[in-house]
Amino acid sequence: MKIIQSPSPNFNDRKAPVDMLVLHYTGMETGQAALERMLDAEAEVSAHYMIWEDGQVNQLVDEDKRAWHAGVGSWQGDTDLNSCSVGIEIVNGGHNVPLADGSLPPYPDAQIKAVIELSKAIIGRHKIPQARIVGHSDIAPARKEDPGEHFPWKQLAEAGLGLWPTQAEDAPSNLHLIGRGLGVGNTGAPVERLQQMLARIGYGLEPSGIYDEETQACVLAFQRRWLQAQLTGQTDLETLRRIMAVEQGFRNEG
């Protein structure tokens, strides 16, 4: 894979070994604008790599250094995610630059092919677990939406990157106590059980038994990745079964 070197001044030393991969979209008008921003010392943002629509890859920060891409976030108990992760920015306007009809711009095949090839190389070098291949919205659900519900997570999983619940429909439905569904304002044991499952997957959520805005944000982030046609932030039975299946898959991997 040909990689163009575009050194960014925005990095420092890691405080932990690499065991995580974080995927982002750039969310800007053009890839050039995103690249220039990550090369600007005053912007204080960067990523290790950026992948253009045609599959071109630029490296901005060496993998042994701490790029500044994750910001404030949490996954599986870790909070200094810049220290333990490699970050890839994928050129795509996303929610910030939608198409004329309001839809999200697609990720071209050549770009996704490059994402898969580069990601495989990274996880091979660092022995990154499948459960630690995440999107920006996974680690910061209350403030980030990328790489978006239009990102082909299932395609990546089929290529060996990340987990996909193949038996979600068959997951136990014994949480019938969910009733008609859970949403903001609901409280009690069913909510706490839901929060515990989301926390075990990795979301930075403290089980409280209260379905608050933080819980809603985590459910929505989950749906952006594993139930992309259903972006409600509500937990109906389909969402619950998918959450249970993903949690089981993560537990089996561990």
PLM feature segments, named:
Residues 1-131:
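Active-site-adjacent loop/helix surface patches within enzyme catalytic domains
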Residues 59, 71-73, 77, 105-134, ...:
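Cell-envelope/ECM-targeting effectors and their regulatory/trafficking segments
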Residues 94, 139-140:
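Short Gly/Pro-enriched loop/turn and capping motifs at secondary-structure junctions
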